[in-house]
UniProtKB/Swiss-Prot annotation:
Membrane among keywords: yes
Name this polypeptide is given: GPI mannosyltransferase 4
Family (UniProt): Belongs to the glycosyltransferase 22 family. PIGZ subfamily.
Topology versus the membrane: Multi-pass membrane protein
Lineage: Eukaryota, Fungi, Dikarya, Ascomycota, Pezizomycotina
Keyword Glycoprotein annotated: yes
Name of the coding gene: smp3
GO CC field: endoplasmic reticulum membrane
Listed pathway(s): Glycolipid biosynthesis; glycosylphosphatidylinositol-anchor biosynthesis
Molecular function via GO: alpha-1,2-mannosyltransferase activity
Enzyme Commission designation: 2.4.1.-
Amino acid sequence: MWRRTYLLLLLIRAYFALSPSYIHPDEHFQGLEVFAGRILSYPSRLPWEFTSERPIRSVFPLYPIYGVPISLLKWFYTETGTESPPAELVYYVVRGVMFLLSFVLEDWAVHDLVPLPRHRRVALVLVASSYVTWTHQTHTFSNSLETLLVAWGLVLINRIIDNKRRSSLFSCAILSFICVAGIFNRITFPAFLVLSLGLVVYNFPRRPLSFFSLVGFGLVFFCIAVFADTTFYKPSASFADVLRSPVITPLNNLLYNTDNSNLALHGLHPHYNHFLVNLPQLLGPALVAMVLQAYNRGFIASWFKNLRAASALSATAMLSIFPHQEPRFLIPCVPLLLSCLQVRKSRIFLGAWVIFNATLGFLMGVYHQGGVVSTQLAVPSVISTTTSLWHESLKGTQSLFATVVWWKTYSPPLWLLGDNSTLNLNIDTRDLMGKPGSEMVKELERLVPTCGSKQKSTELTSSLEQPDAVFVVAPKSVTFLDQFLAPQSPDSSLELLELWSYKKHISLDDLDFGSDGVLPTMKRVIGRRGLGVWLAQRPGCRAIDS
């Protein structure tokens, strides 16, 4: 029975892995935006983590996950003599890679970490039925990679400790790679393994070869990581330059995150936020069950002896010291804690667990900013189709310049625009984020050509400040746009003509319970869900009639 349940949950995980939801900008801008721009020459806008004088993000642990699949796709398309791979294919291939890593490495690690077969089956089903596994773990987060590295770090530590007759040289060498990759991936990684590594160090006097294997290979992998980062950020650097001025991203990251003034830019939280807000958000009814079981003294004693529980709770406590706390920072705790839960046959728990994960699974895995990826993938074809008549009137091979204004959404990943050289398009993306509606209108007033400059459509300029066409992408739940929807009277200053929409999109940032009330807000955000693309034009001189 449990095998059929597990296979069903595996299909659910695959469904969410291939659903284009958008949980957080970091899943694109701290990985795919970088490698798609560098390898495929797609449009890209690197975040400050990669462009500052002291970059804080390492490419060493990311290249095998993102760079290798993208490079293989590029090689295949080059060998077949075709153009660059479409951005949509790259997106789903990398998502498929994340699904396989989650299925193979995460589940395998849970299988190895839980010793008793009866408890192992329950642990596998609990982890496989968590919405965090369906969504966060199949997205391109550094936290998702951290989860795998933490889990396998614990697996190897268990093997080293249990194997008392041999030195476990190979396990120590692999553990050293995991530690280096984990630290270069996220500086929070040591918090999850510090207690477990203490047990390994305790055994070193009896097995000195294990010590030399761990430290020796660790130094080798550290040097490789520093060399990879230095040559990435300084492509023209020689070997001597790498030795003189290496780029050590974990050190830069640590210096940045230990400065509270820097953390304040990202949002400060109370120190109890991880325990009282983030863990309940990730675990739901499972956390309630753990708290209820904590009243059993024997259960508490067993948890302190449990390496998985001790690692998760100690890491949560250490990460709570820092005032910037997001739920995804605790993603590695989810499989560790769920694998410790002793679930009895309870219909109440089962019902609550199913409802909790189904609700958050569809919210975070399908609807949360779900239209951003699909819309960005569709933008080139929408612009090309809309402006086809203008394009036919152009002379020569001049490109058509289009400005796309994104409003009240997460930042659109530019790499999803792909290679548009064959469409003869030059797309300028303006991200207005959550600016007030009045500022958005001012931006459109500045960009949209007036009726007196209508000839611009056939007399192109090379300036992106004066586009040939202006498009607006915004949630359909934003009622502010209703006053501009076509048709408008000729006396109006702006008119928005809807061209395209994606229904599975909900913007939680658009919730305004204080001004509108709870029920009206939920009715608006859910009832008018979707992301739309509009053509902005002057009603007195429409390029396209509604």
